[in-house]
Every structure is written in C-alpha cells, then in structure tokens.
Design a protein with these regions (language model features):
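Interface amphipathic segments
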Residues: 2-325
C-alpha cells in the first residue's frame, strides 16, 4: 500500500511503503519507509509472540533511522521565527536507534540524536530480566555535547543559551527494585581535580559522598536512588562554581556553589509513616554586585512533625530562623 498527503503548511508526504509479515513465531516489519520532500523515516522491527505474552524467550528487535530536513522544519513553523531559520544549520536532524534481544536481555546498541555542528546525544546499554521485579537490572549510559547552538537564541529572545563545549554525561542503573541515576553537567572550562570527579556512582557503588568528595569546578553533579518497593529515595546535588550566566545571559546571576542532600521514605506527606530529611549549604552566590555565602538550611519530617531551620552567617548578616509544626 502507498499513502500520500499534503498538509496546509506545505508539508508533503510523497511516499509510504511497507510490508508486514507474520507466522507462528514472529510479527515482523522487514521494511517500512516514509518520505517527504525533505525528510525520511526507515523502520525495521521483529516482535515474537512470546514477548506479547510476557515470556522471556521471545525475540524483540527494532531499527529506526530518521532524518528531518531544514525544509520541513521551515514548513512546520509556517514562516514564523525567520531569524531562527536563518541561523538553523543546513543539515538534517538525525535520529537513529537499534535495539535487539529478548525480555531476558535487551541490548540498546545505539540511540543517537543530533544536528550536525550543533549538538549530539548518544546512549547505549543493556536491560536484564525485565519481567522479574527482583532480578531485573541493567545500565544505560548517556552522553550529550553542544557545539554551535546560537540558532536557539531567537526562540527565547536571547534569554537562554548553551555555550559550545557544554556536556552532560550520565548513567542509569537498575538492580531489582532499586534504580539509580548519576548525571554530570560540565561547562567548557570544567576540569577534574580528584578521582571521584570522574568515578561513576550507581546503585552498585554508593559508598562515595558527592557532597564531601566531588570537587570539579564549573560543574554540577546529581546522584539519586529510588526503591520501588519501599518508596524510599536518596539524592545528592553538588554545584561547584557553575556560571549560571552562561545559560541565562540576560540575567544577573553568575557563579553558584552549593550542595543539597535529601533522603526519605514514602510519598504521601499526610501519612504518619512518611519521613524525609533535607540539608544543604550555599557556599557562593554571585548576583549582580552581591557576593553571598554562608547559608545552611535543614528540614525534617516525621510522624506529621515538620522542623526547618535556616542559618545565615557571613560578612553581610547573621540570621537564624526556625520553623516547627
């Protein structure tokens, strides 16, 4: 079968071609393609009947290749944001994915998205025992980096920017009911100072303390865990001399250094068994001509009792505040 259409904006689907086959073992699409005047999509997939019945041995695979051309981006915008289109790269946005395996082990060989000379994002990893809540596990690694992202500025009137060389790396992990994520945001000037700065933290390796050991400047790092069975969570955030002005060039917020720790159990904050503990420190906050430092805060909740405290001790002020309720 072939299907074509033309939308009022001028977006035109010029061809569609595909084939579906099935037997007692598999449903498969050996070929499916869609094309517009500037873009294309290619899909191949296999799904075992066992997978649909949540059995572990059924085959599961998919390959996707897609490109969205600048011409179609212009048609979707309908002539708006002409400055954005003038600075948008004359290259297609590319998306590629390749996954293969079964419910015992699903391997994400490739997940890529990017715009040439602008940015790229990549992910890969394995997921294990997906139907077993106690044995499931796996790791997904993520990496993203920016290059020339100036074409975004017209969309936000210059209020938001991503400087060339800004990067994000991360790892997502599963171990039974526990999930973990470790994200590292680096500005172009970031440099590792200790081994911990580059050591991955996962649900398998949580003995290090970000708030005490992470020292990389011009960087921010988030580590978090969540237990699906207990609704228990833990998170650490460390920000070291992160220049917020690089992201918000029209704002007056510059260097920020701070750390935050949170842990707890339960998501119903009206239940007596729900508890959480939060503590943090602001070591540096540069706003306009003000350079603030020396702020500590804590908050705890347990058995319907909330306690919060703020301590500010620096050259400009000395303040203590407390809330009990």
């Amino acid at each position: 079968e072939e299907f074509v259409f033309k939308e009022r904006s001028g977006l035109e689907l010029v061809s569609t071609e595909g084939r579906i086959a099935s037997d007692s073992v598999l449903i498969q699409i050996p070929k499916f393609t869609m094309k517009t005047t500037a873009s294309s999509l290619d899909l191949q997939t296999k799904i075992g009947w066992d997978v649909l019945e949540m059995k572990k041995t059924g085959v599961l695979s998919a390959k996707i290749n897609a490109e969205i051309g600048k011409g179609d981006v212009a048609k979707i915008l309908g002539g708006r944001d002409t400055l954005f289109l003038q600075t948008y790269p004359n290259k297609p946005f590319v998306f590629r994915a390749d996954a293969e395996g079964d419910l015992n082990r699903l391997r994400l060989r490739t997940l890529e998205a990017g715009l040439a000379k602008a940015f790229e994002l990549k992910a890969e990893g394995d997921l294990l025992h997906l139907t077993d809540s106690t044995r499931r596990g796996g790791e997904i690694n993520l990496a993203a980096e920016t290059y020339d992202m100036r074409f975004l500025r017209p969309l936000t009137d210059g209020r938001f920017a991503l400087r060339r060389g800004t990067s994000l790396k991360g790892i997502f992990t599963m171990a039974g009911p526990e999930m973990g994520i470790d994200l590292l945001l680096k500005q172009p000037q970031a440099r590792a100072k200790t081994l911990v700065d580059s050591t991955q933290l996962t649900v398998y390796n949580d003995t290090l303390s970000l708030t005490e050991d992470f020292q990389m400047r011009r960087a921010a790092r988030l580590y978090a865990q969540y237990d699906l069975l207990k609704d228990a969570y833990l998170a650490d955030l460390v920000v070291n001399d992160l220049d917020i002005h690089q992201f918000l060039p029209k704002d007056s917020l510059f260097d920020v250094s701070m750390n935050l720790h949170a842990d707890g159990e339960g998501l119903d904050f009206f239940a007596p068994e729900t508890r959480f503990n939060v503590k943090g420190t602001v070591d540096k906050l540069h706003y306009t001509t003000y350079r603030l430092a020396g702020y500590d805060f804590t908050a705890t909740l347990g058995n319907h009792q909330l306690d919060a405290a703020l301590l500010a001790r620096n050259s400009a002020m000395e303040v203590q505040a407390r809330l009990d309720g």
